[in-house]
């Protein structure tokens, strides 16, 4: 059965990961050694708890972004995704030849006041039996 981690352990782990991300791994013993080198931690059990939580967080970071931890690599990746612009727009009017809709959708477009030139009405074979 596991224990609840205190906010001291969580905060210290997050700070250490943000500052020394490149030195941390999924290995508890390596993280324990890095904690000894870079931080002044009051007791051995506290150091072990922090190193254990760092190991836990590093495994989570491998799977995806973790809330509360901002790593420069993740920030750059997020910026790249947010600023992505496709070369050819899928809704570019010059690229669209025609939009195929059924009669109900056509009626809704007319009722809403949309006057789209590329709309062609197609009858659906499966809706005729209603």
UniProtKB/Swiss-Prot annotation:
A Pfam family per the record: Ribosomal_S17e
Disulfide-bond pairs as recorded: none
Region called Disordered, residue ranges: 74-97
Keywords assigned: Ribonucleoprotein, Ribosomal protein
Gene Ontology molecular function terms on file: structural constituent of ribosome
Record GO cellular component, one term: cytosol
PANTHER family documented for this protein: 40S RIBOSOMAL PROTEIN S17
The name this protein goes by in its record: Small ribosomal subunit protein eS17
């Amino acid at each position: 059965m596991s224990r609840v981690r205190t906010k001291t352990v969580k905060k210290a782990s997050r700070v250490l990961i943000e500052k020394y991300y490149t030195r941390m791994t999924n290995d508890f013993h390596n993280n324990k050694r890095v904690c000894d080198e870079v931080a002044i931690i009051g007791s051995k059990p506290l150091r072990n708890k922090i190193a254990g939580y760092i190991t836990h967080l590093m495994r989570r970071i491998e799977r995806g972004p973790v809330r509360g931890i901002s790593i420069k690599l993740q920030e750059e990746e997020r910026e790249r995704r947010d600023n992505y612009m496709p070369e050819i727009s899928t809704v570019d009017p010059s690229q669209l030849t025609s939009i195929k809709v059924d009669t109900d959708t056509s009626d809704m477009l007319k009722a809403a006041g949309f006057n789209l030139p590329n709309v062609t009405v197609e009858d659906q074979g499966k809706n005729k039996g209603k």
